[in-house]
Amino acid sequence: MRQAEVTRDTLETRITARVDLDGSGKAAFATGVPFLDHMLDQIARHGAFDLDIRAEGDTHIDDHHTVEDVGITLGQAFARALGDKRGIRRYGHAYVPLDEALSRVVVDFSGRPGLHYFVSYTRARIGSFDVDLAREFFQGFVNHAGVTLHIDSLRGDNAHHQCETIFKAFGRALRMAAERDERAAGAIPSTKGAL
C-alpha cells in the first residue's frame, strides 16, 4: 500500500497530509487558503492521487507559512509513500494548456532536491493569493520529497490560467513518475542501486 500520513506541527502551522498514490483523485482540503485548496485539487485530480490535507496556520499574518508548510508536508508524505522507490518509473513530464496558457513540468524522483522554476506571472495576485507563494509551495515539496523539478510557464496572459496549468501539469508529471513500471520488475530505477 503506497500510502502515508504526515503531521507537521510548528509555532506557525499545524498540518496533516494524507496521500494514497494509487487512488482515484479523491480530495479533501481545508488549508485556510482557498486558492491553494483549488490548486491542490488539481494535483489530486490530474495525478489520480487521493489527498486529504488539513492546515491551521498564522494566516492572520499572511499565507506564506501555510502554503510553504503544506508543500513541505505533502513532500514528506510522498517520500514516505514511495519508500525506496523500487519499481517506479522515476521520471515524469507533462504539458498542460488552459486556453492561452501552456506549462511544462518535468520531475525526477532522484533523491536530489532541485527546483528550476521559470514562471513570469502577468500579475502579482490571483484574487488574494500572492503568486510568489506558488514557488514556495514547490520549493517545500522538492526539499522534502527529494525530487528534481523543472517548471516552465511557456505562455499565458492570465495569471490564474498560468498557475492552474502548472499545478495540473505537476499532478500529471508526478503520476507518471510515481507509477509502477511493470517492466522494471521491482528494481530501483538507478544504476547506483539506490535513490
UniProtKB/Swiss-Prot annotation:
Pathway: Amino-acid biosynthesis; L-histidine biosynthesis; L-histidine from 5-phospho-alpha-D-ribose 1-diphosphate: step 6/9. Its main location: cytoplasm. Pfam families: IGPD. GO terms for biological process: L-histidine biosynthetic process. Its EC number is 4.2.1.19. It is an enzyme of class 4 (lyase). The keyword Cytoplasm applies. Disulfide bonds: none annotated. InterPro entries: IGPD_sf, ImidazoleglycerolP_deHydtase, ImidazoleglycerP_deHydtase_CS, Ribosomal_Su5_D2-typ_SF. Belongs to the imidazoleglycerol-phosphate dehydratase family. PANTHER family: IMIDAZOLEGLYCEROL-PHOSPHATE DEHYDRATASE (PTHR23133:SF2), IMIDAZOLEGLYCEROL-PHOSPHATE DEHYDRATASE HIS7 (PTHR23133). This is Imidazoleglycerol-phosphate dehydratase. The lineage of its organism: Bacteria, Pseudomonadati, Pseudomonadota, Betaproteobacteria, Rhodocyclales. The gene is hisB.
